[in-house]
Amino acid sequence: MVGWLFLGLLLGLFFGILTYRIVTGRRRPDRLTLAEYWVYVEEPRVPKIEAVMTRMVSENPHTKPGSPCISNREGMLFTDLRLHYAAVLKSKNPHAFRPDLFSVSTEPTAEVLERLADCPGFLKCRYQCETLLKDQRHLTFLPHMADAFSDLAKGHVVYDPISEEIMTREEFKERISSAKNLESPLFHLRIVWERAEEGWRAVTKGLMKVGRSEWASSFQEQDQEVLVAGLFT
């Protein structure tokens, strides 16, 4: 009797673990997917989600006839628990308004620095997942959410902490308008020529958006930038 009870407990434990894996997905610490945008604004309050949805779907200025930017496929992310957005105040996080404290590859222009001085906060939107994704719809959804935040809260500057790139609101908007496919690496991936003690190397910035580790070349002489970076494209 005890043996059958023990067997029943083992089977229950096995099926419990199996069900958990099916529901949550297979976790891979090395496959963290993280995409994020900071939109520096005059009005650091998260707009009502209904207004954001309207701006992204029915009133999206980037939509072309017969080809909506945010379809039902992307729209499902509005209720995805892996989507996070919040307001961040300059008074409580002054370091987040200092691009000189960001990575070396983040190169703000004089105009960006001037605009940052006029922003009392920023709106952050992030998509983070620790399981293998079936598609990359978040790569389309998140830039449009950042652009909507910018329009609704009087944005001035947009920072991408994953690709380590900062730009004016107009530059970001133009990139979205001119992009044929926001899920393309051309929109999200950068190749940076980076200096270290051992020499220079080409490094990718943005692969974490699709759950992959950044790539890096072997160390080279400084004048090999064009040749080495070309191998990544």
Describe each model-derived feature in a short phrase.
Residues G16-L34:
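Transmembrane-cytosolic junction motif
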Residues M1-G8:
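Feature marks short, highly hydrophobic, charge-poor N-terminal signal-anchor/signal peptide-like helices
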Residues R31-P47:
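N-terminal mature-domain "stem" immediately C-terminal to a signal peptide or N-terminal signal-anchor/transmembrane
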